[in-house]
Every structure is written in C-alpha cells, then in structure tokens.
Amino acid sequence: MKIPLAVILGPTGTGKTDLSLELAKYLPVEIVSVDSMQVYQGMDIGTAKPSLEDRKRAPHHLIDIVPPDYFFTVAEFKERALKAIDEIYERGHYPLLVGGTPLYYKVLFGEFSIPHVPPDLEFRKKMREIAEREGEYKLYEELKKVDPKTASKVHPRDLKRIIRALEVYHKVGKPISEIAGEKKEDRFFVSKIGLYMPRELHYKILEQRVDKMIEKGLIDEVRNLYLKGIDERFVSMQGIGYKELLKYLKGELTLEESIDLIKKRTKEFVKRQYTWFKKYKDIHWFDVSQYSLSQLAKLVYNTIINDWESQGYRYQDQEGVDKVND
C-alpha cells in the first residue's frame, strides 16, 4: 500500500513550522519532525522547537523523544519515522514531514541505507581531540584516504559526519559508502515543498533569530545542560548555538564572540542546506517573501493535492478543496 504524504523542507529560518501549522487548517495532517536536533529533550530554544501551544494545533512526532546524552542515529530516525507515518495514515490522517535535515530525507526515501554500527564514544573523543589540536581538515584528509566517495559528498567542516564515517571504517574495516549501498524505495505518493527567500533578507532574519534565542534564555538552557554533565562529548551539544555558548561558559570565548560565531556558522549551514536541497529535482520551490502565510498555505495545499493526483492518488476531501479556493 502506497501512502500519500507531503514534505515541507528548506533551510533554517524560512518559516517551515508556521506554514505546517497553517496548512493543518486545510489538510488533516500529523506532523513528523525531520530535524536531527529536535529529538533531544531539554533543548528547546536553540533547536527552535514548536511551542507546546503550537503542538496542540496539530499532533507532532519525533520531538522530545530522547535525552541529550543519547546517541540518536540516522537508522533509528528512519525506523521511528516510518512507524509514525504508518500509524498516522492508519488513523485516517496524512503525514506531513517538516524539517531541514537533508540526510534524514535521503535515508527515509530510500536513496541509501545506513549501516547499524553502534557508537564508539572513546574513538569519537580521540577524533575531536585531533580536530581541536590539528584542525578539522586533518580528519577530512584522513577520510579522503579511507573513503574518498564519502569525502566527496561531505563538507570539510561537517565534523559530525566525518567522524561518523571514520568511526564506521574503524569498527568494521569498510568505508561507509560501501556499506550504505544505493537503494530506491517507492512506498509513497510524495509532494515536496521547498521554502526559500532572497539571501540578503534571509541573513538578516537569521541574525535576528539568534538574538531572539539569546533573549529567550538560550544561555541558561546551555548552562543547565552543562551542569548536568552534557558537554561537547555528546552529539546533542554539537548543534549550532550550543557548542559556541558552551565555549563561552567554559571561558574560552567572550559572550560577544560566541554570539557572532553562532551567526556566522548559522549562515554557513544555511548555504550548505541550499546546496543539498538544490540537488533534488522534484521540489516545488516557493519564495516565502512573496506571499502572506495564508496565501502560501493555499498555494501549497493545491500543489500537494495536484502532486498526489498526478501520481495516481485521488484525494477525497472536496469540501477542503472548495474552502481553499474561496
């Protein structure tokens, strides 16, 4: 049985959450978070999680599901996401995938499989010490030697993925690219919606976004985690905003330096997100600066229905179509 689902993706700060909640007025959806950081409990401000009030407007899945000291793998994401998708459809609702983690989408839609190799925390600690001492490019050069195929697809500063690839090679003696063979799946009727905005406007919004997070208490959020023993050893603390403020709390950076670094790295990450997403050929892109939220939701609704029907799924809620077209 093929399941109809929709995807709202795009770089950080483009309004994916707002659109998903507006779309829920027209389409009976449950939202599945496709965000590698929102899975962690106690990390709310820096990950821009939907508020508890927002989560009452539509059911949400894969948010706050593991503690911050837990190593949440891509393979586990796929398993949990597929389970949520099946259960949502069984309840008579439509799965709406929302988030900006490209690797999660690639795995979920079967573009490649992920090896089930448990984490080696000691190995990771050694790798991070090397990166701190000799620079991130040292590890990237090592990855190029043992797994050039993966290295060609990973940004030289994407330390988390570089260390994971080296870890897999260290534990099983094979490149992760060799284990993660290509594997296409055709389980879904899919409509992919992408959000973007002009770069200058986007960067301005990103800077304001960081300032608002600081005002909301991001420093205290990081401090509380640090006092509980959650530091740079854990994957959760590698998220942008957390690792920079951790350096401030440890006296390695001033507050101004750490905030400037958060803004800089957020912009760099957004550039990489645009690069990743632009590789997909089947995304309907919308410039969010050109529409009100209500206008955009109606356009996206009709795009989703048209996509499903062009793939052979007949959407039955004619009342909903009329309401959107009014």
Curated annotation (Swiss-Prot):
The record marks T101, R124 as: Interaction with substrate tRNA. Monomer. The keyword ATP-binding applies. Residues 35-38 are annotated as: Interaction with substrate tRNA. Catalyzes the transfer of a dimethylallyl group onto the adenine at position 37 in tRNAs that read codons beginning with uridine, leading to the formation of N6-(dimethylallyl)adenosine (i(6)A). It is an enzyme of class 2 (transferase). GO terms for molecular function: ATP binding; tRNA dimethylallyltransferase activity. Its EC number is 2.5.1.75. ATP binds at G10, P11, T12, G13, T14, G15, K16, T17. GO terms for biological process: tRNA modification. Belongs to the IPP transferase family. This is tRNA dimethylallyltransferase. Substrate binds at T12, G13, T14, G15, K16, T17. It holds the Pfam family IPPT. It comes from the Bacteria. InterPro entries: Dimethylallyltransferase, IPT, P-loop_NTPase. Keywords: ATP-binding, Magnesium, Nucleotide-binding, Transferase, tRNA processing. Its cofactor is Mg(2+). It catalyses: adenosine(37) in tRNA + dimethylallyl diphosphate = N(6)-dimethylallyladenosine(37) in tRNA + diphosphate.
